[in-house]
């Protein structure tokens, strides 16, 4: 959080739009508390909403319309004035926002890694051949199939509590979840091991919260500015540029993860086929002192992946899933 910027006094009331899942409400409450600490006289309210993505639980995101299913209703609330800002898990935000909306604020990142959760086993390597592993993302599925072809990977939908419930009743030997969500809800003890990014590269923006507002709300952007975390923002801007450049979506196993070391931003990107048979990898580093530098780093990694044939994978998967994705 950047506390050096003194924002102007906000209005008497601000309304946060949020999904109604326990994790989403925790995130909205986290932002509400941060704003209340900055502006004690401001009454910050939360407008809970059920999105289409929360309602469709019998199919994977890649088959029902992708990440936009989690944000459309929240954007409608911004557009019609019911809410001033919307809080998102950044990995769930489409790479291209609809006209009239902007991501004004990116907050400091939680642990971006994937977590191995099981009631019987300590790690993926400990799972017997044929064990069923649940995951909600094609990215994780592709990496699991590439490194552990002896395991059976099956879809896993629902909110965090629902997914843990399916594990506890024996539907899966293990499940893979974002570590950040578990830690935010005080469920860190459910994590048996954290997956090394070398084995399971995080999704672009994983672990970070983004705040979306209507374009042109410069006053609101100024009030939110103290919550913006520059290092996290540079990292996730680079990551999202990889996906944006390649046309990534929920139909494509694509990952991008950036870290800071000695003043330089190091970015790695991956594009794979869902069966894990092809995994393309690229990486680059740059000082990335500005947003433009971070975006250029993302383009560089995307260009390396393009040279290896990434666009062939993206086009093939997008064509194959086109009709389903519009359902």
UniProtKB/Swiss-Prot annotation:
Catalytic activity reported: 4 porphobilinogen + H2O = hydroxymethylbilane + 4 NH4(+)
Molecular function terms in GO for this entry? hydroxymethylbilane synthase activity
Quote the cofactor binding remark.
Binds 1 dipyrromethane group covalently.
Q: Which UniProt keywords apply?
A: Porphyrin biosynthesis, Transferase
Other observations noted: The porphobilinogen subunits are added to the dipyrromethane group.
Tell me a GO biological process for this protein: protoporphyrinogen IX biosynthetic process
The chain residues annotated with the modification S-(dipyrrolylmethanemethyl)cysteine are 250
The pathway it acts in is: Porphyrin-containing compound metabolism; protoporphyrin-IX biosynthesis; coproporphyrinogen-III from 5-aminolevulinate: step 2/4
| Cited function | Tetrapolymerization of the monopyrrole PBG into the hydroxymethylbilane pre-uroporphyrinogen in several discrete steps.
Q: Which cofactor does it need?
A: dipyrromethane
Record organism: Paraburkholderia phymatum (strain DSM 17167 / CIP 108236 / LMG 21445 / STM815)
Could you say which protein family the record assigns here?
Belongs to the HMBS family.
A Pfam match: Porphobil_deam
Name of the featured protein = Porphobilinogen deaminase
Q: How is this protein annotated for GO cellular component?
A: cytoplasm
Q: Which PANTHER family match?
A: PORPHOBILINOGEN DEAMINASE
Q: What InterPro entries does its record include?
A: HemC, Porphobilin_deaminase_cofac_BS, Porphobilin_deaminase_N, Porphobilinogen_deaminase_C, Porphobilinogen_deaminase_C_sf
Q: How does it assemble?
A: Monomer.
Enzyme class label = transferase
- In short, the EC number is 2.5.1.61
